[in-house]
Amino acid sequence: MEIKNSTLASDTKASHLSYIGDAKVGGNTNIGAGTIFCNYDGKNKHRTIVGDNVFVGSNTSLIAPLKIGDASIVAAGSVISRDAPSESLAIARPLQQNKIGLGKKIMLKLQKAAYKIKR
């Protein structure tokens, strides 16, 4: 875990493989493994504020500037780019789609391309 220019209040847990930059994180909050606080837009750094009693699921990206209100939940795997009010569930990820037969078709194309490169 890496923390830069950030404060974490008491009883807050942040797991391995997370990056917390330019943030203020409230108390009794859980930051899941692999969560990234995306604070830099290529020109400026922005802050993220996470309230008290918040649960952020694993492999989540929080795109600053952003505020997550108290007692909220952020669903695992989400890319959150808008504020989440207190006591809300923030979920931002596309639904899974299963394209029957497409996996095999893509694998065959990749195998043919790899064969051409090796020759």
What is each of the regions a protein language model found here?
Residues 1-119:
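Glycine-rich hexapeptide-repeat left-handed beta-helix
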